[in-house]
Every structure is written in C-alpha cells, then in structure tokens.
Regions:
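HotDog/MaoC-like acyl-thioester-processing domains
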Residues: 1-9, 79, 83-88, 94-172
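Short beta-strand/loop turn elements enriched in aromatics
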Residues: 48-62
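Catalytic strand-loop segment that frames the active site of acyl-thioester-processing enzymes
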Residues: 1-52, 157-172
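Short, basic/aromatic beta-hairpin or loop at an interaction surface
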Residues: 61-70
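Residue-level preference for alpha-helix termini and adjacent loops
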Residues: 30, 36, 62, 76-78, ...
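Generic structural detector for well-ordered beta-strands
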Residues: 23-27, 78, 124
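Short, structured beta-strand/loop micro-motifs enriched in basic residues and often containing a Trp
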Residues: 71-75
Length: 172
C-alpha cells in the first residue's frame, strides 16, 4: 500500500469507475514448485489494483477523510491457464456496478491477449464495524447516476448469506 500511496503523486487521476490496467511479472515468490503462479497470489494482485484505483481517484479523499475501511465481502476466481515464472501479465480492473451496499469489480488476468484468469469481487466500506452506505460517498464525489451490476455478477454472490448462516449452524 505504501508503494501505491507514493506512486499516486506521479500518476494521473482516474475516475472511480474507470477501467485501469497494470503490468506485472510473475516472480519466484509468486510460484509453486512447478514454477507457475500459485492460486494464492491472484487475490494479492487483485487487492493491489483495487487499492491503486482508490489511491488514484477521488475515492481516496472520500474514504480517508472519514477514516473508513474498504473491505472485501466476497470473491470468485476462475483459473483458466497457468502463468509461468518470469512472464509478464496484465491485470485489468473493470467496475461492474454498485448497489446501496456493495461495489462490484471484475479483474482480468491477461497474457499475450488471452485471459488466463478472472476474479469477480464485491466489496464495501466500513466504519466502526458498520457497513457505510455508499450513497454518501458517491454524493461527495458528485456522482448522480451509478451503474447497476449485471445479473450474472449478482448471481455469483446470491447465496453468500445463506452459506454463512448454514456454516454457523454446523456441528463441530
């Protein structure tokens, strides 16, 4: 996060819903014994690019000023093809819309113009253990219209609450 906060001073500002792209290289600590990027590293790159979006947009001041905490609510990652050590890849972050509580993003992991993995997340903003209404933040940014998430994105997370409730009822 420190790197992102320093770099924000040298990068152009982006809109809160703008698609951004960052090129990375698969390093040796990203890999498993087969020298391909381990599944655990994909969420790290997804977090990085979401933080970059916050740092480079007006969301940074809206969130930091209020001492809010952006937090991941749920994610799904589809791995299609492996990425080998030392190879370059791009992470593309696209906004998939929002509702009154959640912000949805789609992350594409591209290499040689081919999608190697896709990560879909929903996140929210917390203050003192209470999810904060995004409406206030959007008003502060001057946003009058927001994009609703597509049905396929909503459907991915539809059963989340029920899954957690059932997990809490299980016998240990």
């Amino acid at each position: 996060i420190i790197k992102i906060l320093v770099l924000r001073n040298f990068q152009s500002e982006v809109n809160y819903d703008q698609t951004i792209r960052r090129t990375f290289r698969v390093g040796p600590f990203d890999c498993d014994g087969l020298r391909i990027m381990t599944a655990a590293k994909y969420p790290v790159y997804m977090d990085f690019i979401r933080w970059e979006l916050i740092a480079r947009s007006k969301l940074y001041h809206a969130i930091v000023k209020r001492r809010l905490a952006p937090s991941l609510g749920s994610q799904k990652i589809i791995y299609r093809k492996p990425m080998k050590i030392w190879s370059k890849f791009d992470v593309i972050l696209e906004s998939a819309g929002m509702d009154d509580k959640w912000v949805y993003f789609v992350h594409y992991f591209e290499q040689d113009n081919e999608v190697k993995a896709i990560g879909i997340v929903r996140s929210l903003v917390w203050k003192r253990d209470i999810p904060t209404a995004l409406t206030d933040i959007m008003k502060e940014l001057g946003v009058t219209e927001t994009m609703d998430p597509p049905v396929w994105v909503i459907d991915i997370f539809k059963a989340d609450k029920e899954i957690i409730e059932k997990a809490n009822l299980r016998k240990c």
